[in-house]
């Protein structure tokens, strides 16, 4: 499992392709790739999107980058994938499930 924070490129306008992005989500949710995700908003203006936070199931960091690049936001350079913050995550708890010691 991977924790991802990917900010939008400085001049990006995600609203121009958000419908295409959302239309692609069911496939990666249903196959278990996207565990959780959502829009990150600017703290000073909660209506202004600045990126995305995701939990992605993949084997390697390189696989995560491929998933990001295949997303509409990746294809249209909305996300600044080169500067994405990607870390392997050992998930101890998520709603409905807890790690058993």
Predicted regions and their residues:
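Conserved, structured core segments of small domains
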Residues: 1-101
